[in-house]
């Protein structure tokens, strides 16, 4: 009797369906949700200074998952935690998202910029280069091994500031209106373990797949929209050779309030609001 029941349960249609779904999750090419960020938890980087989104209650304030070189660079000018380019989006005293904004800076005798474009990204800040080589101070990427990231869905609002300027008064052609920029870059970690930075983010030879979009102001102004950003292979051979058992990879997610902020070009008052970011991976077999 017991044997008969066992055989019957193995042939049960619901059991077969559940087993099929489980097996499907481990087949190469299947898209699965991997991570999501809602920006409801924030951490004080240091007392009285700025805050950053936190991914766990026990996250180390000196080694956060999210980083912002624009915030760290602004510590010399700010007098309040609410002044920074990246701050929490708060409702009734509780965080419900992130605000990334382009703010007024300081330019004097060739040092600094009149507009500081806010940027929030996964990675670190190299404080040694903040003043002399600011683009190299942004260390983009965090370890990633759940699969090959293919989709980044994010819910956002964006408004552009009134006037686009060059923060160092250079005579260059300027865009008529500011836009936000979002990048997702999946790259291989080579022997030197170096990071992509503001110079190499879009061009480094180690990039496996990437996605990029520029966002115009949302209309109506106060409505939330969801955008689906797809990462496409940059190097087919490197993409096909992805192997999480023998190699290491990082994923860089970069959100900026001014799409040409790295060139000191932007509009004071441009503001990108984020409420949720979700990732989907394409499973890569381990054999």
Task: Give, region by region, the residue ranges found by the protein language model.
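C-terminal motif of bacterial Sec signal peptides marking the signal peptidase cleavage site
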Residues: 5-9
């Amino acid at each position: 009797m017991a044997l008969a029941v066992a055989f019957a349960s193995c042939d049960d249609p619901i059991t077969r369906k559940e087993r099929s779904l489980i097996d499907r999750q481990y087949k190469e090419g299947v898209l699965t949700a991997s991570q999501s960020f809602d920006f409801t938890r924030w951490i004080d980087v240091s007392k009285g200074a700025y805050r950053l989104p936190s991914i766990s209650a026990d996250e180390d304030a000196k080694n956060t998952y999210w980083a912002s070189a624009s915030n760290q660079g602004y510590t010399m000018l700010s007098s309040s935690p609410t002044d920074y380019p990246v701050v929490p989006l708060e409702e009734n005293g509780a965080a419900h998202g992130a605000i990334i904004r382009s703010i007024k800076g300081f330019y004097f005798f060739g040092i600094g910029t009149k507009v500081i474009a806010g940027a929030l990204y996964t990675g670190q800040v190299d404080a040694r280069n903040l003043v002399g080589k600011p683009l190299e101070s942004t260390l983009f990427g965090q370890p990633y091994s759940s699969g090959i990231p293919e989709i980044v869905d994010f819910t956002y609002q964006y408004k552009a500031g009134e006037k686009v300027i060059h923060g160092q008064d250079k005579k260059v052609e300027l865009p008529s209106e500011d836009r936000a920029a979002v990048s997702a870059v999946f790259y291989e970690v080579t022997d030197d373990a170096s990071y992509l930075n503001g110079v190499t983010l879009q061009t480094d030879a180690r990039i496996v797949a990437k996605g990029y979009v520029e966002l115009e102001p949302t209309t109506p102004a106060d409505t939330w929209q969801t955008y689906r950003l797809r990462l496409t292979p940059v190097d087919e051979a490197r993409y096909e050779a992805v192997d999480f058992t023998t190699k290491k990879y990082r994923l860089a997610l970069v959100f900026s309030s001014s799409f040409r902020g790295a060139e000191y070009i932007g509009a004071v008052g441009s503001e990108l609001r984020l409420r949720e970011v979700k990732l989907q991976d394409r499973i890569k077999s381990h054999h």
